[in-house]
């Protein structure tokens, strides 16, 4: 079983370090690239989308932090689901998260490999994907300390890059930089702020939520805090920082060029600076995109490997994935993660582009389903009152709005149904698991 608060080893992580790790695990291709899709869908109202998504994410993390403070668990949200609703909830939650993260790692590998191919066009995509996959696994192999330091350093680099864009954008708006003959594009009417109406805001909301994906890793890391009750403080700092720099940077990008200039294929930061003769800066940003994608890739690998070991402890995964006493790494768990990575790379290269995109959309949605279960678990285990209960219900409404918005967009609708298909498969496996557990628990006939 998972460790209880009494026998939980004391952590050595300060709350601000968890905040920094959270930034490292969150700022990735979901923001640097995914925000362009949100802009295309929503226009200027994308700023409202990011504010809504930031608030919703904060409400979810606040509940996860309360659970972590009450009883730190290695399995985090999976352990809390098990406590709240039984073995089936822990089992299904774990495998929903594992499946979604492995699919997401495939898209992350593809994205950072494409960025690298910009500099080395002759090298096949799979070569870069393989190199980044091995590097990511090496960081996980070296242990928790190296993972923490890596995410801290990459978090600083990514945050500095966003601040660099903000400074450059302000200089451009002030006319200090040469080029960029588009003028400043400020929406003067409601119809200009909502160019695609309420439906545009609705369908773009899901991509704003994707930019905040990563709080689950903070939940898994919260057990290493010196004071688990400070998890809430680290989440507040991290999410407030992200929401502010996200909204300011995207707002500046929108002011620099006309809306029709943005495309789903290019980062809004590259699009907005293209006319300013800043080739070196654009190359620097290409490098930042690689760092950002690699950072979130490593976070995903850490999460799935750690969670797999914990699930094995709880009987929700084969016992061979249990971390042996005195060992720092579970080789079978790392091996399965490697196998999942290889499969993700193959799928991204072999499957038709639209089918693979539907699968990665489904993976992002499944991550939000995990967030919903965090809310359900908190409602049952913490018995919230007043503002706590209001936060839970508001977060549920906001997540439901983001998920349902995919049904009204032709490109994302198939991803919703693919996510439901994955849930059905995992539900069937869960029922088989429950049945087998029932047979094990049943006393033998005399």
Swiss-Prot record:
Keyword annotations of the record: Amino-acid transport, Cell membrane, Membrane, Transmembrane, Transmembrane helix, Transport
Compartments, record wording: Cell membrane
Membrane topology field: Multi-pass membrane protein
Source species, domain of life: Bacteria
An example Gene Ontology biological process: amino acid transport
Coiled coil: none
Transmembrane region(s): 20-40, 42-62, 95-115, 127-147, 160-180, 205-225, 237-257, 284-304, 331-351, 355-375, 388-408, 414-434
Protein name: Uncharacterized transporter YcgH
Organism this protein belongs to: Bacillus subtilis (strain 168)
């Amino acid at each position: 079983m998972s460790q209880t608060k009494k026998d939980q080893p004391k952590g050595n992580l300060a709350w601000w370090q968890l905040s920094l790790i959270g930034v490292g695990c969150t700022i990735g291709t979901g923001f640097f690239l995914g925000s362009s899709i949100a802009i295309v869908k929503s226009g200027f109202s994308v700023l409202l989308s990011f504010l809504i998504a930031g608030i919703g994410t904060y409400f979810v993390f606040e509940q996860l932090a309360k659970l972590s403070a009450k009883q730190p668990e290695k399995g985090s949200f999976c352990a809390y689901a098990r406590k709240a609703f039984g073995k089936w909830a822990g089992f299904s939650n774990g495998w929903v998260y594992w499946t979604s993260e492995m699919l997401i790692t495939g898209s992350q590998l593809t994205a950072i490999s494409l960025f690298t191919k910009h500099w080395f066009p002759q090298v096949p995509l799979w070569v870069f994907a393989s190199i980044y996959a091995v590097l990511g696994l090496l960081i996980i192999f070296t242990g928790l300390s190296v993972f923490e330091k890596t995410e801290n350093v990459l978090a600083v680099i990514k945050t500095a890059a966003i601040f660099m864009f903000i400074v450059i954008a302000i200089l451009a708006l002030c006319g200090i930089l040469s080029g960029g003959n588009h003028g400043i594009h400020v929406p003067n009417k409601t119809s200009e702020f909502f160019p695609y109406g309420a439906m545009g805001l609705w369908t773009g909301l899901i991509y704003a939520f994707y930019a905040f994906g990563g709080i689950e890793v903070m939940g898994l890391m919260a057990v290493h805090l010196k004071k688990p009750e400070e998890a809430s403080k680290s989440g507040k700092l991290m999410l407030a920082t992200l929401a502010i720099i996200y909204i300011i940077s995207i707002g500046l990008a929108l002011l620099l060029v006309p809306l029709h200039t943005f495309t789903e294929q290019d980062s809004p930061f590259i699009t907005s600076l293209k006319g300013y003769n800043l080739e070196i800066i654009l190359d620097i940003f290409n490098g930042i995109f690689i760092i950002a994608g690699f950072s979130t890739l490593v976070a995903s690998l850490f999460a799935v490997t750690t969670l797999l070991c914990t699930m094995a402890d709880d009987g929700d995964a084969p016992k061979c994935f249990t971390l042996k006493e005195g060992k720092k790494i579970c080789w079978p768990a790392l091996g399965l993660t490697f196998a999942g990575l290889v499969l993700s790379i193959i799928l991204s290269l072999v499957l038709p582009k639209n089918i693979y995109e539907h699968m990665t959309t489904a993976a992002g949605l499944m991550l939000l389903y995990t967030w919903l279960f965090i809310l359900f678990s908190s409602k049952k285990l913490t018995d919230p009152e007043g503002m706590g209960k209001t936060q839970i219900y508001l977060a549920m409404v906001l997540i439901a709005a983001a998920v349902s918005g995919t049904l009204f967009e032709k490109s994302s609708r198939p991803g919703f149904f693919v996510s439901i298909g994955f849930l059905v498969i995992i539900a069937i496996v869960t029922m088989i698991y429950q049945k087998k557990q029932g047979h094990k628990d049943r006393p033998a006939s005399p």
